[in-house]
Amino acid sequence: GKRPGAGCAYLEPWHLDYEDFLNLRRNTGDERLRCHDINTASWIPDIFMRKVQAEEEWYLFNPNECPELHDLHGEAFDKKYNYYCKKAEKGEVKNFRKLPAKDLWKKVLKVLFETSHPWNTFKDPCNIRYTNQHEGAVHSSNLCTEITLHTKASQYKEGEKVKTGETAVCNLGSVNVRNHLR
């Protein structure tokens, strides 16, 4: 038998577009804002869950204003995230949104219940256990989430690609050993 290919888009809950991302698989609303043929997953840092539990505020940022967050995890991420929260409060970050972390978590769970997407994957545990840490932070996994996948973005300078990135794939296959025995 053949199984069709599948892809998955991951986004972290600090991203300014995260709430729109949550709704990509919904069956209601503006169809131009929906994406029914791709899987979605949240790449959740531990600090988000701590803020949910403590009923604290959560900030969503434009990644252009805080580009380091994407490649950080654990304490380094927490420190830089809190740094940008303070900058936002001082008016030094232009594009951000603040809301109760618990409210955002409720939205995540509501949409997950309605659509089975995005599934929740936890960034810090995945990176702590990542066997190729010398390659940098891992940003995604295979569809079953038991294998973390390393990716690197292409690099551009003045609109020209100067370095090609790396795309991760997970090829699944099966072999019926009996067919190969004599």
Please describe what each predicted stretch is.
Residues G1-S174, L181:
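Active-site cavity-forming subdomains of large catalytic enzyme subunits
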